[in-house]
UniProtKB/Swiss-Prot annotation:
<feature type="binding site">
    <location>
        <position position="229"/>
    </location>
    <ligand>
        <name>Mn(2+)</name>
    </ligand>
</feature>
<feature type="binding site">
    <location>
        <position position="227"/>
    </location>
    <ligand>
        <name>Mn(2+)</name>
    </ligand>
</feature>
<feature type="glycosylation site" description="N-linked (GlcNAc...) asparagine">
    <location>
        <position position="204"/>
    </location>
</feature>
<dbReference type="GO" id="GO:0005794">
    <property type="term" value="C:Golgi apparatus"/>
</dbReference>
<dbReference type="GO" id="GO:0015020">
    <property type="term" value="F:glucuronosyltransferase activity"/>
</dbReference>
<dbReference type="GO" id="GO:0000139">
    <property type="term" value="C:Golgi membrane"/>
</dbReference>
<dbReference type="GO" id="GO:0046872">
    <property type="term" value="F:metal ion binding"/>
</dbReference>
<keyword id="KW-0472">Membrane</keyword>
<keyword id="KW-0812">Transmembrane</keyword>
<feature type="transmembrane region" description="Helical; Signal-anchor for type II membrane protein">
    <location>
        <begin position="9"/>
        <end position="36"/>
    </location>
</feature>
<keyword id="KW-0808">Transferase</keyword>
<comment type="similarity">
    <text>Belongs to the glycosyltransferase 49 family.</text>
</comment>
<protein>
    <recommendedName>
        <fullName>Beta-1,4-glucuronyltransferase 1</fullName>
        <ecNumber>2.4.1.-</ecNumber>
    </recommendedName>
</protein>
<feature type="topological domain" description="Lumenal">
    <location>
        <begin position="37"/>
        <end position="415"/>
    </location>
</feature>
<dbReference type="InterPro" id="IPR043189">
    <property type="entry name" value="B4GAT1"/>
</dbReference>
<dbReference type="GO" id="GO:0035269">
    <property type="term" value="P:protein O-linked mannosylation"/>
</dbReference>
<feature type="topological domain" description="Cytoplasmic">
    <location>
        <begin position="1"/>
        <end position="8"/>
    </location>
</feature>
């Protein structure tokens, strides 16, 4: 009897041990399965935001190379230029969107990346030593977390010559090292940025817009130079590439992209049909309509909005240049550079458009593509020194036009 009881106890102990072993194996299996699922999720995440030491090291190496020399001084000696803070492989025969921005306005890059499918080149101006530090950190964070930035964007930095930019510590400023996605970087930038009134830098340094424009477009055979707070129509890059593939004889021609501004409460139009509907009810108007109507009037907006709808981008009509037209355009070949003596507000773009005219360029308005600025441009939104700067640059513009006569002595055109 006692033997039978002992056998039964041993049997139950063995059964209990077996059940416990099975339970442990099941827990181990579930743990491994969960770990595998988590690994798959991580792999999917890292496919979009590669965190490998190699990719981070490449970014560091690129920034270190660009910053190591201490930059080069511009022709005036007032600014320090760092080329290739970020680099990307660009086909010299592609159409590059070239733009410029203060550090605060870099947040507009997000919208440009969505609308412009081709390569971008942006020149960033840092007015202070702190902004120069922030610019290098932003370059590090954006290139680390934004695949589109790594693939399509070249970035250059300009700061006053008395400052030098340093290799960034990604932990400073603003804890950008804690971010894990491209959207988080742009969201963080929107929170730390302090957008102000146009050209109001709060320092004794002038915003070198033409230096920045030249820097952004200097490696491009074909470039559309715009302000960073403008947005191109959907498919504009594809349309321009198709035009370029069909005919690369753009030398001597400026393909004008009509520019508009939209009421800030309105959604940005994607295509011409949406834009025209808003234009007809006054929610969209010609660019600079409230500040300088003649500056864009030769585009002939009434003619443009009434063109028949077409699927292909093409030049629609030729417009003779007249002062003070300053269109946004795409051109190839030897395009005159922007005169870097013009800084801050006034005559910085018209001076280059004037030289295009004297050099013999033709101006042809595209039928479908366009640019839109978010918000109506109003005089009260500019800094108090605007008029003084405008008068100073007006005097320089008169001198510039006299210089063009000597530069193009055989040209029949004058501004």
């Amino acid at each position: 009897m006692q033997m039978s009881y002992a056998i039964r106890c041993a049997f139950y102990q063995l059964l209990l041990a077996a059940l416990m072993l099975v339970a442990m194996l099941q827990l181990l299996y579930l743990s491994l399965l969960s770990g595998l699922h988590g690994q798959e999720e991580q792999e999917q995440y890292f496919e979009f935001f590669p965190p490998s030491p190699r990719s981070v090291d490449q970014v560091k190496s690129q920034l270190r190379t660009a910053l190591a020399s201490g930059g080069v001084l511009d022709a005036s000696g007032d600014y320090r230029v760092y080329r290739g803070l970020l680099k990307t492989t660009m086909d010299p025969n592609d159409v590059i969107l070239a733009t410029h921005a203060s550090v605060d306005n870099l947040l507009h890059l997000s919208g440009l990346l969505e609308r412009w499918e081709g390569p971008l080149s942006v020149s960033v101006f840092a007015a202070t030593k702190e902004e120069a530090q922030l610019a290098t950190v932003l370059a590090y964070a954006l290139s680390s977390h934004c695949p589109e930035m790594r693939a399509r964007v070249a970035m250059h930095l300009v700061c006053p010559s008395r400052y030098e930019a340093a290799v960034p510590d990604p932990r400073e400023p603003g804890e950008f090292a804690l971010l894990r996605s491209c959207q988080e970087v742009f969201d963080k930038l929107a929170r730390v940025a302090q957008p102000g009134i146009n050209y109001a830098l709060g320092t004794n340094t002038s915003y070198p817009n033409n230096l920045l424009r030249n820097l952004a477009r200097e490696e491009a055979n074909y470039a559309l130079v715009i302000d960073v707070d403008m947005v191109p129509s959907e498919g504009l890059w594809r349309g321009l590439r198709e035009m370029l593939d069909q005919s690369n004889h753009w030398d001597g021609t400026a393909l004008v992209v009509p520019a508009f501004e939209i009421r800030r409460s309105r959604r940005m139009p994607m295509n011409k049909n949406e834009l025209v509907q808003l234009y007809q009810v006054g929610e969209v108007r010609p660019f600079y309509y409230g500040l300088c109507t003649p500056c864009h009037a030769p585009t002939n907006y009434s003619r443009w909005v009434n063109l028949p709808e077409e699927s292909l981008l093409r030049p629609a009509y030729v417009v003779p240049w007249r002062d003070p037209w300053e269109p946004f355009y795409v051109a190839g070949g030897k395009v005159p550079t922007f005169d870097e003596r013009f800084r801050q507000y006034g005559f910085n773009r018209i001076s280059q458009a004037c030289e295009l005219h004297v050099a013999g360029f033709n101006f042809e308005v595209l039928n479908e593509g366009f640019l839109v600025h978010k918000g109506f441009k109003e005089a009260l939104k500019f800094h108090p020194q605007k008029e003084a700067e405008n008068q100073r640059n007006k005097i320089l513009y008169r001198q510039f036009k006299q210089e063009l006569k000597a530069r193009y002595p055989n040209s029949p055109h004058r501004c």
